[in-house]
Amino acid sequence: MRLRFALLFSILSFYTISGQETFTVNGVVQNFKPIHVFTNAHIILSPTSEIENGTLIIKGDKIIAVDTSLDIPSGAIIHDLKGDYIYPSFIDLYSDYGLQKAKKGQYSYRPQYESSRTGAYHWNEAIHPEIDASREFVTDKESATAYLKNGFGAVLSHVQDGILRGTGSLVLLSEKSEHENIILPKAANYFSFKKGVSKQKNPSSLMGSIALIRQTFLDAEWYSAQDNQTNLSYAAVNNNQELPNIFAVNDELDYSRVYKIANEFEIDFIIKGNGKEYSRIDEVAATEFPIIIPLNFPIL
């Protein structure tokens, strides 16, 4: 039975491997990059574009050409894929791959009103937009293998805790080092209405979470116009404004809540849905939010 190739060319095609290392190499540096040519394949480029009897050329870790008729480089290793398909990989846009999960502190019967964090940060522990996933990312070979078996080639990973959660990183699922797997260190901002592991008393309700988000945006706007103090949380809100904004909702009712925040502060949100959007489909559609929808296939 012919080996069927699942090539992750949607990722490799825009990811360039630099010839210069940023860390020491034990032994002789290997600069040779083998060339693999896959011929006679049905290549799916996008939902609306495909090539029959196509040829795909890979040099090292980078796709250098895809077409129906290409000149094959001398010395290339040729793979005849007649009858086989080559697809782009999936990308998980809502993952915490390679990151440690946030942990709750020890229980105390006394209510906590002040933040226990030290430093020039926001006064509420659930607001931490300064968190940068790329600074905490560690390649996880076991988890990566599970992803790869299901057709994923990359993930957008962030710390899934808090209300303003910080930035996520776009990373490859290879066994290589963190230096090579991180494609975009800061790829998106993440939000939710859940306070997460914070033990502070506030916010204690959904209304409180909404108020805290609005107040944070207003404070960040004020902060941008002053130079008397430093607040790393407000600075992160302002510095990362141009990134995509992904908001995780708890249920279908949250769409209207996020919509009001988006209108007030002129923010374009992408919604990470929960699969219950069908119950208020007209209201959800009216927001015109791009939505990341979970898939749950039946067990075969």
PLM regions: where:
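Bacterial Sec-dependent N-terminal signal peptides
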Residues: M1-V25
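Histidine-rich, glycine-flanked metal-binding segment
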Residues: E21-F23, V28-V29, P34, I43, ...
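Polyanionic/metal-chelating signatures
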Residues: D140-F269, E277
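Glycine-enriched alpha-helix->loop->beta-strand junction motifs that scaffold or abut catalytic
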Residues: A262-D268, A285-I292
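Active-site-adjacent beta->alpha loops and helix N-cap segments on the catalytic face
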Residues: K276-A286
